[in-house]
Amino acid sequence: MDTFVPTGRYKRTDLANIGTNVWTFEPVLALSHFDPKGGPELSVKLMYDFNTKNKATDYRSGQAAHVDFATSYNFNPVTIGVTGYYFKQTTDDKQDGLKVGADGNKGEALALGPLIRYQLGKVPITAQWQHEIFSDNRTQGNSFWLKAAFRF
């Protein structure tokens, strides 16, 4: 269970805010097939979001299902593949208890892009780029991720 807390500055009158002023509870199921000796890999992460109401605006974003996925081939020490996500809002946004807009302001998006991972000793370093192919009722853009995983 992932939990996102309302941290960061939030001001109702600002066009953009660092904080969200809501809690989000997100059950997660993640599955991966990975052979450290090399070969094909597949990872899927399923999530479902439950949002609380923003008390400053009386706005509640709808529930949403989303999946992160990656398929790749491990050549040791380099892995290359494709990564992406699909997001679909399943319930309407509501403000003052009423549906927002004719379609409930339901968001949907699909992104795809390349990934490359290099195994540096015991530390995997991954770079991935995701381009949103389409987006509805959400901002549309690109994401670039660079991550390293360390065991403690």
PLM region spans:
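Outer membrane beta-barrel transmembrane domains
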Residues: 57-152
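Outer-membrane pore/translocation modules
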Residues: 1-60, 103-107, 119
